[in-house]
Each structure stands twice: as structure tokens, then as C-alpha cells.
Amino acid sequence: MDTLVDVVRLGGARFDRRPALLIRPFFRTRAWRYRDLAETVPRAARVLAEAGVGEGDRVILWAVNRPEWGIAFFAIAHLGAASVPLDVRHTVDFGRKIAGQTGAKLVVASRQTETSARELGLPIVWIESLPDSARRAKPVEPAPVTGATLAEIVFTSGTTGEPKGAMLSHGNLIANATAMAQVMPFGEKDRLLSVLPLSHLYEQVLGLILPLTVGASVVYPVSRQPAVLIRTFRDFKVSVLLIVPQGLRLLDAAIERRVDQADRRATFERLHAIARRVPKPFKRLLFRSVLSQFGGRLHTIGVGASALDVDVATRWTEMGVDMLQGYGATEMGPVISFTRPHRNVLGTVGEPIPGVEVRIAEDGEILATGPGRFAGYWKNPEATAAAIDADGWYHTGDLGAFTKDGMLTFRGRKKDMLALPDGQKVYAEDVENALKEDVRVRDAAVVGWPLGPGLKVHAVLLLDDSEVEDEIIAAANLRLAPHQQIRGSTVWPDEDLPRTTTLKVRKPDILARLEDLERPASAPIPAAASKVRREALDASVDPVTVIVAGLANVDPAAVADTAHLSTDLDLDSLQRVELLGIIEEETGVFVDDDALAPDATVAELIALVEAARDAKRGVGAWNWPLSPLVRAVGIGFQILLIYPFVSLFYRVRVSGLEHLNPDDGPYILTPNHCLHLDNGIILSRLPLGIRRKLAVAAAADTIYDNLLQGVLASVIANAFPLQREGGVRKSLELLGARMDKGYNILIYPEGKLTVGGPLQPFKAGAGLIAVEGGTPIVPIKLKIHRMSIIDRRRFPSALRGDVELVIGAPIWFDIGTDHATATTQLEAAVRAL
């Protein structure tokens, strides 16, 4: 396996029907099997080629994590082109700069980045619709790529400075992934939850390429809120997680809250004390109830991007989860060292991975080389020469040392870059330049300063007038990206900043002095909170405000409706996600984090919560009819009872069975509803391969208003209740759960029985199910040539009627198709049979 093309091709051959990429965007899981990837990627490459992409071109990939990101990434590689991934949080200015530097031909974007992507002035392919477009395209042969072919250019996250693009080849990425396959306990039965941005090489290599080389599955959550993540863990039985330290703390905090809410703190701490003295299997047994909240399969968490909190890591280790930490750099493809489960020393970043060499320079800098090392920076020979020495060693700019046991320890950054707890990187020079654009600033220095468990961007200013401090910070933040926002500031009291003999600012001296100054950012209440209006609150204070205040560590009386979550209350991107998770836990209301703007006000958050109160997620499984015993009984009833009964009253002819292939499902079958026995006719005449995996959506208000009738329907027809009015979300979740298990769905789009016809207008929900189901829709028409006495129910009538069951060709609806349009097209397809 030498190239990304090989990953897809060999994966399809080796792992075939195993699920590769999974996501549940609405009521049903969309899954791409390994064979699907092998078939879809060459077709998606055709779509990109027809949009103007050729061998050697660059394509900007600016989209959120989802399976289609991987499809686009591999399709670009298939053409011999290079991906240029951008973080969804990057600014338009940054995107323009990268597009200009690389001469990109195209941008692949998602709906979350639509506004920014359009500003680049390049042709756009929408990532959500790429698989649909690929399905209609012919596959294209792969370009003659080799391990040395450029696969992608990954740019630093600096916004106001000149970003550098690290050039990574196919061989760099494959070498790092295959080396990590020897380090991480990863296999075909594992499922990894992808939460870190795929634009970051750590997630891309360890969270996408590596799993696909070993036959594992990658699950994409629809939100990063802790409550949603935990539900995703549970629903998909996730076993491996890659995360940044702050994200780990969010999950840990969610567990701690549940412990306190259940009043089990003393018991919880006793279990931890016992766990320190027993082997891993017993640890997992002690914390079985906690781990079951995560699906019961979680065994490994890999942490990267910034320093791991040893106390938090210890808590997870005591629960029987291996806590592994890595160190690396984009320029090394990216992993340099990683701890091993059998040699895991918390507080270190482990040993060099196979094939990578590491040495410590005389000044303490970490130097590395190996097959993952990049070739250089895009069109920047000066920066390349500064990073790679004559002997081929990459100079990381980081300081470290080896322990006597050969473990690498990270001691800080030689270069002036801040690693925030959410994994984002901020170059101090970029923020300083934004501050210095203001003529009122004589000089500025930016440092990372502790606030709670992580670092915040803190500005130290030399001003003639300290009264303008807040104005200067606010103006600079308008020019900075969300992750670069200045969270605290200090006016330097001396005439000048401390400097070296060469007049460089001495930031260690600044950090030491900040301890004694009046407004350090390390105060328990964020400095920015002082800007919030402090008004007395009465007993009717909104509970959302109380939750916000608790997370921001401020008095609720200090939180005004006009306070901005980011700039006033210092909540970074992951803290805003945590906020929505706490709101869901405490109020039962789910708010999609995509709906919350980075700098939304408290009032806007409250409005979002109120708007979402009527959209609470339903629960319920109705799983008992799916048990093998019940299904065997049901199929027996169909063969021994339903078939002869239907045959007594109707002669049934069937056409179109060639359109049904059990391997291409699950299908959604949409017949007209014109006879009392139409359910029996369909159930008894469909092929057994389809029927044994068939579930019927039955009207909850008619079939399930009688207990005996509902039980019989569930046993014989594998029916489940579908609400025609209200409670729709729960019904859709029941429908989706069956499709996720491979069941075909029989649903009557008219919504009611009209004996003898004519065909009634289809309900609007039919289009929603057809589009969001993401599966082939099979139109079916029951043609009545002569009605039986059982349906006509009057004399004189024939005892035995004559009907024809016509099965049409499957129809696919593209993601994004208007639901009303889909309903109209589906109705027309049934009428035309």
C-alpha cells in the first residue's frame, strides 16, 4: 500500500461489505461500506474532473467533518491532484490568501462554509451532493500516482501573517498511518468517533486514513455537544476516540455532573480508590455503569494538539480506558511519538513511532526525520531551508528531552505560538500585528495566560491613554479569526516592555510580572466579564442565563441579555459546545451548535432554546418485533395463513420483481392503498429475501389503538407505529432504526385507505422520508382488474378478484431535494405504473 488510491482500492477488495464511514444526520444512518467507497470515489473523481480538476491541480477542501469529506479527499487524490484543506473556522481573507498562493482550480464546500466559499470566486462543488452526482457519473481511471506524488498542502493557521503550506506526499501520509497501525490498538471491529477537524492532519491520518487501512469504521457525530457525543458513543458502540485535552475535559465534566446529579459522589470516589489497585478488566467492571453510557466499548482515547491534563487522564485510566498521548507536527505527517498501551507513562508523549528518528539538539530543540517528513513549504524555499537542515532533520521549534526510559517529554515551544486547549494554534505575531494597526498602541506583546484549565490569548499593551484599552481590544478582535480572539488584556505600567539587548521583547519577564498586576487574565472571573452590565436579577431569571453564568464563572447578576458569549464571557468554541450540552442535560432542549453564532448574545441563545422546545428528540425503540423468534413466527404466519387467505379472494399477478435486489437495499416501498387486503397481497408476493427484512409503517391512531390488533400487526407484518399527526420525530426514529438494521420499509404515502381508488394525493411527509432516507425508493402500484367480495362487500360480487402488483424501478432523490418536489415526483411515478 503506497498511495491513497491503494487505500480505497484495497479496502474495497479486503473489507467489502464492512461499514467504513457512518453518520446519522436525521432519522437514519447513512453508511458507506468499503465496497461503496471503492465504487463511489472513481465516480466522484469524474465529477471533479468535469468541473475542471486535472492531474497536478490544487483543490480547496473547505467543509465540516462528514463521510463526504473523505470521499472528496480520496477523489482528489484519485485524479493526481492535491487537496488544500481549510478549517471551517478560517476567515474569508485567509481562504483568499491560500487560493491565491496555490492557484486552486476549485473549492469543495459544505453548507456551513457556503458564504465564505463563494467569496473565493472559484467554481464550487457541494460536498453534500457529491455522492449523488457520483452515482450518475461514470468511473474514471486513477492518475499514475506514486508515493512521491503530492497529496495535499496543509497551511498554518496564521491569519494576518504569511501562512506556510506544508507539502505532504501520498507516501508521507501512508507511512505515518501504517506506522501508527503498529502503535494504536486498532482492528476491524473498532469504531472511531471523528470529532477533530479533518482539516488537521492529526485527525485526517489517525481518524480517517489509518482506520481505512485496517478495516475499522469511522463515525461522524452531528454535533460536538457532550450529550450528543455520549448518545453517539452509545448508539454506534464507539471504541476509539481522538480528541484534544479540552474536549476530554468536557466529557469528563459531563460524567462528573451526572454523578453529582445522582448524589453518588462518595461511591464514585471509592470506586476510583479501588480501581488504582486492580488490573484493567476489573477497572472496567467497577465502572461498567459509566462506560455503558458510552456504549460499553470505549477502550482507547488518543490525545494530541496540546498538553494532556494528567489528573484527567488518570481518572479515565482508572475507569479502564487507555489514555494515549502523541506529539507531532504537520511537517512530519504528523505523528512523531506516541505512548503505547503497554508502556504508557502519563506526562510524557511516548516513544518515536516506527520509522521516525528523534534527537535533541544542543539548545534542547526537538529534531525529527523519517518517511513522513514533508518535502518543504509550497513555493517558499527560504522557509523550507530554515525548517530542514542539510542532514534532512526537521527542526520542530519545540523544546523537549528524553527520560532515562526513552520517553520523550515536551517542554514548551521555542517559536512564539500558543496551543489553545481546543487544539487551535495562534501565532502571537499575527495578533500583535492586528493590535499595532491601531495608532494608539505604542507596542504590544501577546502571551498565553492560564484561565481555568487552559490557555487564553492575553494582550499586553503600551498605551499613552489606558482608558482606550477596551476599544483597542474590541477593534482588534473584529480583525481576528474566532480562535485568535483576545480574551484578556493588561496595560503595561512601565515606560517600555522588558527587552533583550537586541531589543526583542522578553515574554518570560512579562509572564512573571503579570502575576503582580491588577488585571491578570488568570482571575477567577474573566477580565472581559467586567465589561458586562451588572444589573440586579429577580426570581424570574432565565435558567439559561444561570447555566451561562456557571460555565463562565461569573455571578448571574453580571450577565446581561446583551452579553456576547465569546468576547464578553470568554467562552471559546468548545466551551460554547459544552454550554449547549449542559442546556440539553438540564432543560431537555436540544439546540444544534451550527445555529449558535460564535459571538451570539445571551438573548439570542435564550431565543434559540425557546424555539427548540417543541423539537425535543423523541425516544423509544419498539424493538421486540425484530427479535429472530418473532420474525420467524411472523414469516410462518405469512406462508401458512396469509398466502392461502389472500389466494382465496384474489388472483395476483406480479411484474417488476427484477427491480428488487436484496443486496441493493434497504428499500422504501411506496404502494397505493386501495384494498383491505393490499398489505397481505404485498407481504405474500414479495420475494422471501425482501420480505424477511421488511417492516411496515402502520397508522398509530388506527392499528395501534387496539392492543391485540397492534400486537398481531407487529408479529405478522413486523409493523411499527407511525404517527400521522404529532409525535413525528419518534416515528421517524423508529423508521430509521429499522433501516439502520437493514430492513426495507413499506409505507403508504397516501396516508389512508381508499377502497377501489382513485389514488389520493401523497402526504408531504412522503417526500421528507424519500429524501432524508438516503436510500432507493421503489414505487409500487396495485392495479385492480376485478374486486373481490371481501373488498366490495355487497352482492352480487365475485368471490375472487383479480389484481396486478406492479413494481417500478428504484428512484434516488438527491440530498437537498425539495421535499414537496420529491412528493410530487414520487406520486407521479406511482401513477405512471
Positions of the model-derived regions?
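Conserved ATP-dependent adenylate/AMP-binding module captured primarily in the ANL superfamily
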Residues: R46, V88-E119, D132-R136, N176-L193, ...
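Conserved pre-ATP/AMP-binding loop-to-beta segment of ANL
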Residues: R17-P19, K138-F155, E162, P185-R191
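Conserved C-terminal "lid"/linker of ANL adenylate-forming enzymes
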Residues: A445-G448, N477-V532
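Conserved AMP-binding/adenylate-forming core of the ANL superfamily
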Residues: L21-G52, D57-R66, G70-F74, T91-R96, ...
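AMP-binding/adenylate-forming catalytic core of the ANL superfamily
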Residues: V107, I360, G370, A375-G376, ...
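Conserved AMP-binding A3 loop
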Residues: A31-R35, A151-A177
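A cross-family acyltransferase "interaction/gating" segment
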Residues: G656, R692, L708-V711, D740-N744, ...
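Conserved AMP-binding/adenylation subdomain of ANL enzymes
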Residues: I174-R191, L198-R284, R288, R297
